[in-house]
Amino acid sequence: DDNPGGNYWAYMTYGYFAPDRRYSSDKSYGGPTKEFKEMVAAFHNAGMEVYLDVVFNHSGEGGTWYGEKDNYNTAELTFMRGLDNSTYYSLTKDAAGYWETTGCGNNLQCDNPTVRNFIIDSLAYWIDEMGVDGYRFDLAPVIGREKVGNEWVYSKSAKTILDIIKL
């Protein structure tokens, strides 16, 4: 099964700075990026804008999605977990598991400044380098909340990612 999370729509993101090569006909090094840019240019030449569907509420790193079905001891350390697990993910109070409040799996810790910068850098990359015109955010409210104690809350006074990216 080459579909992370067992789906075909690829909402289990691994690479926030690269097109999914499964959807590219050119599998060579740099091929998917080249094809994506060519696709965006073709749409623009036809008078259409390109909006990217982005998923920042969770990632595709396995081992944390299905509770007892997953073995946390053998969870993949392919990306953010291997860099700094407690910075990128919202951990339970005992740090033995992951918060899961969306039905999608491991919540990214979007109120952490490092994670916010990561998200903003990714959004800027897709506009500046890849030429997209805008975004559709999967579960957008998740990136606008912060953790206070053991609860996730929406603070009207907090400066969220959604506030930062408004242009």
Where are these regions (language model features)?
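Substrate-binding/active-site clefts of carbohydrate-active enzymes
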Residues: 1-131, 139-156, 164-167
